[in-house]
């Protein structure tokens, strides 16, 4: 009788160049267990020829390299990787090591929470000049805490197959507590309009009950 193959506790997917209009250089880690965790990841970047780039520093915009982002049971955590140092523009592959895992008591989301850029009419926008606020949605039957960051990207690359890299990140000072099945809007100061191109978020150990 053939033994049933057990799935790995975590799956990792790295996408250097997105084909769906989303951010480049994204990492998705999926939790196949029944326990929510705070993973700490380590990264080794490589170029398109498979050569390691030892002078490149790799961090996650959502803090996955620091063990700050919550990976819920049965759910996924998406992080955007930022590369700095000599050869940063050459990264096309990343080897990921799970350095540490801290278990945490947190329910598994039924549906993913969302964060979007919005204009003055509270409609979703991809135009940084119309980026007046952040719309947040929690469709789940329990409260969550979200940590939100604004992302500024480098200029569009000259070659279509090259990734558009993260240039700078600003994480909002206060985390946002969202009640079950609720939404919220965070209005931004006028002087940041036009400076950022994307908004990202991750779940954080809950402060909301």
Region spans (language model):
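Intrinsically disordered, low-complexity Pro/Gly/Ser/Thr-rich segments with frequent PxxP/GP/PP motifs
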Residues: 51-89, 161-196
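Asparagine-centered strand-capping/turn motif at beta-strand->loop junctions
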Residues: 28-35, 47, 134-142
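Hydrophobic beta-strand positions in extracellular immunoglobulin-like domains
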Residues: 29, 45, 83, 136, ...
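N-terminal "mature head" segments of proteins
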Residues: 1-25
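Solvent-exposed strand-loop boundary residues in beta-sheet-rich modules
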Residues: 47-51, 102, 154-156
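Short, hydrophobic/aromatic beta-strand segments
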Residues: 36-42, 54-57, 144-150, 159-162
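Terminal connector regions
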Residues: 2, 72, 78-131, 189-209
């Amino acid at each position: 009788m053939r033994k049933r193959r057990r799935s790995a506790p975590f799956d990792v997917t790295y996408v250097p160049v997105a084909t769906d209009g989303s951010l480049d250089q994204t990492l998705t880690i999926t939790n196949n267990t029944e326990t929510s965790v705070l993973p700490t990841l380590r990264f080794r970047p490589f170029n398109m020829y498979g050569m390691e780039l030892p002078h490149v520093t790799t961090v996650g915009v959502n803090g996955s390299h620091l063990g700050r982002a919550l990976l819920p049971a049965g759910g996924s955590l998406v992080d955007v990787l930022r590369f700095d140092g000599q050869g940063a523009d050459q990264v096309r592959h990343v080897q990921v090591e799970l350095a540490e895992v801290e278990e945490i008591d947190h329910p598994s989301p039924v549906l993913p929470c969302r964060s979007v850029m919005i204009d003055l009419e509270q409609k979703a926008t991809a135009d940084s000049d119309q980026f007046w606020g952040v719309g947040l949605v929690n469709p789940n039957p329990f409260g969550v805490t979200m940590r939100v960051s604004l992302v500024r990207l480098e200029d569009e690359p000259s070659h279509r197959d090259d990734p558009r890299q993260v240039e700078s990140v600003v994480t909002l000072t206060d985390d946002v507590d969202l009640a079950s099945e609720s939404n919220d809007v965070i209005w931004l100061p006028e002087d940041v309009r036009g400076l950022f191109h994307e908004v990202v978020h991750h779940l954080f150990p809950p402060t909301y009950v």
